[in-house]
Amino acid sequence: MRTVEVEDVEFIYSMRQNEQKTKYLSKVTGSIESQKEWIKSYKLKEEQREEFYFVLESKKKEKLGLVRLYDFRKDSFCWGSWLIKDNAPKTTAIESALQVYEFGFYTLGFDKSHFDVRKGNDKVIAFHKRFGAKIIKKDDINYYFNFEKSDYEIIKEKYRRYLNE
């Protein structure tokens, strides 16, 4: 997992334009050029440690997906915009989730994570529940989850083999 660069614009744009993959995400409008400008502005947020946008990569540097960390609160971070290519290895989801939590909990120093998942996005809802995240609220559109660092430290042992330490 590495932060996005302007050179990733075509990959990001193609992933964000894939209607099957982005069915449960906010829509992206505009062109590759406008996406490039958006990335440039996002890099400023990274410099301020306000938000981070990552490309998920294989050990051979193949681009496998995207994920963002944002909405930083006193002790909690949100993550989302999680997209994984269709032909990515089956372990990409678990590996990227572990990397997100490692970064959020240990690099940034947060104690918990909060995020929402659209209703109907059953695979992602099931993934987070298996991982130990708890639904704390729901509305007509979303389920709202919390996941504590202490819970991560327990589940991390189960999935340690997927961490590239």
Name these PLM-found stretches:
Residues 114-125:
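Conserved beta-strand-loop-alpha-helix junction that forms the acyl-donor binding cleft
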Residues 71-80, 110-111, 141-143:
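A conserved beta-turn-beta hairpin within the catalytic core of GNAT-like acetyltransferases
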Residues 139-165:
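C-terminal "cap" of GNAT-fold acetyltransferases
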Residues 20-40:
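Conserved GNAT-fold acetyl-CoA-binding loop/helix
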Residues 33-76:
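Acetyl-CoA-dependent GNAT
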Residues 57, 81-92, 118:
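A short, internal acetyl-CoA/4′-phosphopantetheine-binding micro-motif in the GNAT/acyltransferase core
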Residues 1-14:
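A short beta-loop-alpha structural element at the N-terminal edge
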Residues 90-104, 126-130:
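Conserved acetyl-CoA-binding loop-helix of GNAT-fold acetyltransferases
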